[in-house]
């Protein structure tokens, strides 16, 4: 069964090289939706994933409802297993063939893949080297918040083989029935990681593109309105982050990271 990943992007030239090099090894096909990028994002997509599609979004403002409508329209064009991820989100499993085989074995049409929020530890950052494109990003950071109870906050993304995902805005809920995929397979969401000037600039550029509805939903507080506000938020979240190398499920996913 065909495996397709779909993703919107806007000025993602910092994370896209890692994201594309990671996911082109897992998925047969990718549909990348450009929301008016003015940097090298499109060029990077064509360079690192020349066999994937790059399309222009018909929505230049960032609006969660319109984004999900557009995504579901595209999902209806393809068959097989489908997943929709943001550029911050990296799907990880031990063995791709075994993972997709297990989806058939379990007999469901939709699965929730648990999400780990990657957040650097401000007391540990001096031990991290500057991120390099020659090494997978998922192998360069190992601090985050593990979804011990993923039902709190719906800490997951969906993979499914329905006509479309029947998502509610934000894509953490679906009108389809689904089960949580419990084997060591996760979405690593680089939320406040790697925490550097490039990541700050990436977050701050999104706020001015929010639609009126996005502002009413309070998304400007999610992406930040100044570097100072982001640094305060990072300090708060950094106190919650854990060294994932001590987590047994994470160890199964990344055995090289055992402390």
Question: Locations of the language-model features?
Answer:
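Active-site acidic Asp-centered loop
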Residues: 35, 85-87
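Catalytic-site signature of metal-activated, phosphate-bearing donor transferases
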Residues: 64-73, 92-259
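Active-site-proximal specificity loops/subdomain of glycosyltransferases
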Residues: 18, 40-85
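Active-site beta-to-alpha loop of glycosyltransferases that engages the nucleotide-sugar donor
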Residues: 2-21, 36
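A structural signal for isolated positions on well-ordered beta-strands in alpha/beta enzyme cores
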Residues: 4-6, 30-31, 53
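Gly/Ala-rich phosphate-binding loop of Rossmann-like dinucleotide-binding domains
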Residues: 24
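Short beta-strand/loop segment that forms part of the nucleotide-sugar
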Residues: 28-36, 57
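Conserved acidic residues
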Residues: 28, 80, 88, 109
């Amino acid at each position: 069964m065909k495996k397709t990943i779909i993703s919107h992007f806007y000025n993602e030239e910092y994370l896209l090289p890692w994201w594309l090099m990671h996911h082109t090894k897992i998925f047969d096909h990718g549909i990348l939706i450009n929301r008016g990028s003015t940097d090298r994002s499109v060029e990077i997509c064509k360079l690192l994933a020349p066999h994937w599609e790059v399309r222009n979004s018909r929505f230049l403002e960032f609006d969660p409802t319109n984004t999900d409508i557009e995504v579901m329209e595209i999902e209806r064009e393809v068959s097989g297993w489908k997943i929709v991820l943001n550029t911050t989100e990296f799907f990880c499993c031990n063995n791709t063939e075994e993972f997709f085989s297990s989806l058939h074995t379990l007999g469901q049409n939709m699965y929730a893949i648990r999400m780990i929020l990657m957040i650097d530890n401000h007391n540990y950052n001096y031990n991290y080297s500057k991120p390099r494109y020659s090494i997978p990003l998922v192998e360069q950071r190992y601090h985050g918040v593990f979804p011990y109870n993923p039902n709190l906050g719906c800490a997951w993304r969906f993979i499914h083989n329905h006509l479309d995902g029947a998502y509610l805005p934000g894509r953490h809920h679906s009108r389809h029935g689904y089960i949580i995929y419990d084997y060591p397979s996760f979405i690593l969401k680089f939320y406040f990681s790697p925490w550097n000037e490039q990541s700050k600039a990436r977050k701050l550029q999104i706020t001015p593109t929010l639609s009126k509805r996005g502002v009413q939903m309070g998304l400007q507080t999610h992406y930040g309105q100044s570097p100072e506000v982001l640094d305060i938020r990072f300090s708060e979240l950094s106190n919650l982050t854990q060294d994932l190398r001590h987590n047994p499920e994470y160890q199964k996913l990344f055995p090289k990271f055992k402390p």
